[in-house]
Structure formats: C-alpha cells, structure tokens
A protein has these predicted regions:
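Bacterial signal peptide processing site
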Residues: 18-21
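C-terminal motif of bacterial Sec signal peptides marking the signal peptidase cleavage site
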Residues: 13-16
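N-terminal helix-cap/turn-to-beta initiation motif at the start of protein domains
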Residues: 23-25
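First exposed extracellular module after export/assembly in secreted or surface-exposed proteins
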Residues: 27-155
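Exposed boundary/loop context
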Residues: 9-10, 120
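Sec-dependent signal peptide recognition
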Residues: 2-9
Length: 155
C-alpha cells in the first residue's frame, strides 16, 4: 500500500517535467526599409496619421506588442535612437496626446509585420512626443524601441 502512495508523487513529478530548452533571447523590432514609420525626428500634422510599419521577430514565439505615445514637453529622454531632434523650449501641456494600446500577435508566429494607421488627433498640443514600441515574446522577454516625433500644425 505504501508503495502505491509513493508511486503517485513520483509519477506527478515525472509528468510535470518539461523541455530543458529555455528562451533566453529578446525579440527583435526591425525597420521595414522605406516603409518603416515612424522614424526618429519625423513630423506628423494634427489631424493626419502615422502609418506604423515594423517587422517583429523572435527565435521561439512572439507574444504581443504595445504602442505608447506621450508628450516630451519637459525634454525627458528614453530614446533608443542615436541623434537628437530639434527641441522647442520646455512647456506645460494643455491637451497632450496620450496613447497606450496593446495589440495581440496570433499564436505560433516567430515573425510578424505590424501595420497600423494611427490617427493624430486634431486637437492635441503640437510639439515633441515620444513614440514607444514594446515587443514581448511568449516567454516574457521584452524589447523597447523609442523614437522622438513631432506633432505639427497642419499646413
């Protein structure tokens, strides 16, 4: 009888074992040639649109991505791009553009081209903004790409 009860935990332990493969690499955010947008220092008019186009890759499986846009009127930084964009004097926001949205990636993908049309609200404060892309793989590894963009008055 004791053997029977000792066998149950052993079977549970053995069946719970998984592959020894461990995902230790972060996913990649890759520009798509001429189509890539946004890029550092690009300008977008209020009431216009950002045509987002990036390729995401991972060695095992992609998870999801997030787009965040927030003002940079105080000149803080977390850009992952080399080079500085033209800066206006620091200012207080009145009606800043704030966007923070998650997007799923279909299960099983190791490569995914993300294409979105992101409308620029017509009533937001013009000025400097950060456009951040967060890409997470199924294991939880995350890659961040942050570029500076400028919202302008329409011509």
């Amino acid at each position: 009888m004791k053997t029977k009860y000792m066998l149950i935990p052993l079977l549970c332990a053995l069946s719970a074992c998984s592959s020894t493969e461990t995902d230790t690499s972060v996913p990649e955010i890759i520009p798509v040639g001429e189509a890539t947008a946004p890029l550092n220092c690009q300008e977008y008019p209020r009431g216009g649109a950002i045509f987002f186009d990036y390729l995401f890759r991972d060695d095992t499986e992609l998870g999801a991505y997030n787009i965040e846009i927030h003002n940079n009127f105080d000149h803080h930084t977390h850009s992952t791009e080399a080079g500085e964009c033209r800066q206006d004097p620091a200012k207080e926001p009145v009606n800043p553009w704030i966007l923070n949205k998650d997007y799923p990636i279909p299960a099983g993908n190791t490569s995914f081209e993300a294409k979105l049309t992101i409308p620029v609200p017509a009533d937001v404060d013009p000025g400097e903004y950060h456009f951040m892309i967060r890409l997470t793989d199924r294991s939880g590894w995350q890659q961040l790409k942050s570029v500076s963009i400028r919202v302008t008055d329409p011509v």
